Amino acid sequence: MKRVLAINSSPKRGKSNTSLILNPFLDGIKEAGADVELFYTRDLEIKPCTGEFNCWVKHPGECYQQDDMKQLYPKLEEADILVFATPVYVDGITGSLKNLVDRMIPLIKPIIEVREGHCRHPPRKRVRKGQLVLVSNCGFWELDNFDPVVLHMKALCRNMSRIFTGALLRPHGSALKTMMKMGQPVDDVFKAANEAGHQLIDDSKMSPETLITISRELLPLEMYLQGVNREFRQALNALTIK
């Protein structure tokens, strides 16, 4: 049975727009027979890396900080598949996920080697060389807003000796929840997220067609802007009235 470790770094946890895509994806993974553990960074104490390199030169493979990374380290080491879920925050991942990623340094050795023509750190023997999948949501309309996050995850995989298997990306994500509540036709997006979970376990990959459906245009740009800006103006007007 494949072991899947999912990290949802949205501060809104299960009520987030990110969870709208993550949850059916994880359901599909479970339905395909894999074991899934889900953690919310909002519920974890993960301190920033202090850059002391104690985990490299004093106590190899062990971080000196006493926080919730202690319970995550063995899970990160043993996971066949890592699923990192994050909304786009200022063109990147959330701060809480960045803290977690920075604290993964004990999983690699300080020695530098050249792999595929580039300097890398080798993983420790106990660390499984598995896959990584990104799930992300953003408030801007265009799909290219995810480019920096995808690039970051691909670089992370190269450094951590994991295979980047793909990304479930949901642009103009707030529209998905609104349209769902209004009964508008968005079920295909959720079904595609679920299907992506099945494909990941059954085929060790996700089809481009499935990922395109997850990211498809929900409504025209101008209509999206009108709706979002109307909500913000109403909120600001309410402050003025008070």
Region spans (language model):
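N-terminal beta1-alpha1-beta2 submodule of the flavodoxin-like/Rossmannoid cofactor-binding fold
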Residues: M1-I112, R158, T165, D187-K242
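Short, histidine-centered active-site or binding-site loop motifs used for metal coordination
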Residues: N8-P11, S136-G139, H172
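Histidine (H) residue identity feature
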Residues: H59, H118-H121, H152, H172, ...
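Short, glycine-/small-residue-rich phosphate/pyrophosphate-handling segment
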Residues: G95-S96, K109-I163
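Beta-strand-loop-alpha "switch" segments that mediate conformational coupling across diverse proteins
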Residues: G166-P171
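A short acidic, helix-capping loop that chelates divalent metal ions and anchors anionic groups
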Residues: S174-M179
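Short glycine/threonine-rich loop-to-helix capping motif typified by GTGT followed
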Residues: M180-P185
